[in-house]
């Protein structure tokens, strides 16, 4: 109650003083004009009238500038870290609430923009300084590599089958491989296929947790497939390999240099190395009817230096004895 009466008294006296000031400011020039009109000296009369008007204008400008200077000096006395958050600091309540709301938002942003203590996990790519995968590894490229190995090489998990035609999908081949298996294997297989199709066809970035789960299921099913009987897999000649799978030996380290007759798992083999294909039942030993449709007599003779240079270049390819057995 006291505060409200104080405000009323303060505003009332302020209005009275302003009216008195404006009244005196208007009356003084008029009084000078009236008194000068009674005088017979026109020069003195003109000086008095103009002087009164000039004094009034200068006085008003001086008061305005003085108010601005005093206001700025008062602002300089306020500490830079001072924020008006109380009713005594800022009378306008909406403005005070706006300041407080922005202070809270600034605090939340400051916590988010701090340097993270742990690596930031972005979907689709491995973070820097990772202890699980190579840094900046793109998860989608790994999934695509698994798909391409099946499509072009007939590689299904850790086995090599002949069902690598375009008509056979990765999902169909897996169901064929585990068709006689029961739960809980089928549950893990369905989960693995679901993740694979999500990664390949959803168009979304792969989350790190889903990718780790995908690799664990891949390893589990790959280990399980080693104990399966691959003879029950139906034989279908591949359009891309141009060679039966029995011509590939899974134990490449047991081969001698002369036994390596074709590049290892190439997506598009050269036309010069195409040969007659015969249906094969499963991965096994070398076929006895393996032959090349190439006339080696047409090849120019190579010098010893050229052979040694080619040998050195090929042995640098470190992909599990792909070309030359060392």
UniProtKB/Swiss-Prot annotation:
Belongs to the DLT1 family. It is found in: Membrane. The gene is DLT1. Disulfide bonds: none annotated. Residues 276-306 are annotated as: Disordered. Required for growth under high-pressure and low-temperature conditions. The lineage of its organism: Eukaryota, Fungi, Dikarya, Ascomycota, Saccharomycotina. This is Defect at low temperature protein 1. Keywords: Membrane, Transmembrane, Transmembrane helix. It comes from Kluyveromyces lactis (strain ATCC 8585 / CBS 2359 / DSM 70799 / NBRC 1267 / NRRL Y-1140 / WM37). Coiled coil: none annotated.
